[in-house]
Amino acid sequence: MQFSTFQKNLDDWQGSSLIFGVLEEEIASQLENIKFVIDPKLLLKKVTQKKFKGEKGEILSFEFLDQNLETLFIVGLGKLKDLNKSDIENSIGNLVRKTVDKNEKMSILLPWEFINSQLEINQLAESVRLSAYKDNRFNKKKDEKKVLKEIEFLNLKKFENISFEETAQICEGVELARRLVAAPPNSLTPQEMSIQASQIAKDHGLGVKILEAKDCEDLGMGAYLAVAKGSDLDPKFIHLTLKSEGPIKEKIALVGKGLTFDSGGYNLKVGASQIEMMKYDMGGSAAVLGAAKALGAIKPKGLEIHFIVASCENMINGSAVHPGDVVKASNGKTIEINNTDAEGRLTLADALTYASNLKPDSIIDLATLTGAIVVALGNDVAGFWSNNDNLANDLKAASAQSGEELWQMPLQKSYKEGLKSHIADMKNTGPRAGGSITAALFLEEFFDKEIKWAHIDIAGTCWTDKNKGINPSGATGFGVKTLVQWIKNK
């Protein structure tokens, strides 16, 4: 999908489908703004008959047969005093999603004078594109309806030099993450994930290294390989590197959990644990690879960024890890596996150690790690933990800008008691209470304490069962926008 602007006199505009946003006040005067396509008095009569008030999310549609304009959508934006960019994005995005298969091009005219920055316009464009996203890769009969190819913004004179290039690049990263998460586990295997990562590297000039099981064994990655043992599919440890030209002012590592399917192992997932949905247990790696795609195109200055994914399956066979086994991670720590369904943190233990050995200034890991975070925060907000206040504040700022909600959780040190083992350095799970916190405390044991670190648990936010905001039902691509915005803010 492309974005464009029409900055000429509106009387010269031609198009077949127009979205017009109105506030919940003085509707008659606002309708004067579209007199270039229809008589405002006639339209006011029709609007009044429909008892349209311009309330938030209210939609009217009109079809015309005798003029160039075929369809007019009037969208209510609510009261001016309550106007915010999120409501605008959701209102316009929801409408576009409903009509995406009816138009190849849609034009949008809003009260731009109440939108404060070019960033907000870019984010609106981003929301429209992501709302219109469709994934029909696995349908026998491809959708033969129209495909929305272009969004045109009318009368953006306040922002006449606006560019949508980065917006499109970010959207492509989110869309990649969505495709990866939505792909069934017989399609997205560890091997396929490594192919996807290698393609990103090829397209954008990133360095790429794929470690095989023997390479990981040589590095002492006993925790990661213990998880992979139960699968007939070989694990793939993925490392992409984006290095800016010129002096490097900061080195960053982004680490994603990459379980392409999680059966739970011998602690088999049953009932409410939704084993059939465990294809999305690689949501963290999807966010990291989506960010790699976007940032590879954007090419931020002065940074060296490492994208790291320890990909494998957690399955059951005669070689699978047992509950009670003790394994050694690559930093030398021994771990008693008291729950084979807490496997993500085992793979991350070696991935974080690997990242730490690169001596970055900051590490951020993303993972669909715990059901406990879903109980705590639901499906709209991801929890995060950090050992550094500046990093935490920077992530909060990036979250607010990107529209992906984060909530900081405590690294409650007293809870480490629950990870103590009688026979090893630690267990991989603690008590049920505070489960997402003990998971974060576990991860904190696997990198140099001088490194700034944040862990983002996206278990509740990487998937939605129904259309919600800018997300069609299915994979959301959560995390890509926050990571990219955090990098761009540097």
UniProtKB/Swiss-Prot annotation:
GO molecular function terms noted in the UniProt entry: manganese ion binding; metalloaminopeptidase activity
Pfam families assigned: Peptidase_M17 (PF00883), Peptidase_M17_N (PF02789)
GO biological process, one term: proteolysis
Organism: Prochlorococcus marinus (strain MIT 9215)
Name of the protein this chain belongs to: Probable cytosol aminopeptidase
Catalytic activity, EC: 3.4.11.1, 3.4.11.10
NCBIfam families for the chain: PRK00913.1-2, PRK00913.1-4, PRK00913.2-3
PROSITE patterns: CYTOSOL_AP
Entry's localization field: Cytoplasm
Function: Presumably involved in the processing and regular turnover of intracellular proteins. Catalyzes the removal of unsubstituted N-terminal amino acids from various peptides.
Signal peptide coordinates: none
Active site: K269, R345
Keywords: Aminopeptidase, Cytoplasm, Hydrolase, Manganese, Metal-binding, Protease
Catalysis: reaction(s): Release of an N-terminal amino acid, Xaa-|-Yaa-, in which Xaa is preferably Leu, but may be other amino acids including Pro although not Arg or Lys, and Yaa may be Pro. Amino acid amides and methyl esters are also readily hydrolyzed, but rates on arylamides are exceedingly low; Release of an N-terminal amino acid, preferentially leucine, but not glutamic or aspartic acids
Binding site residues for Mn(2+) 1: D262, D341, E343
Binding positions for Mn(2+) 2 per the UniProt entry: K257, D262, D281, E343
Coiled-coil spans in chain: none
Cofactor(s) in the UniProt record: Mn(2+)
Similarity annotation: Belongs to the peptidase M17 family.
Cofactor comment text: Binds 2 manganese ions per subunit.
Any one GO CC term of the record: cytoplasm
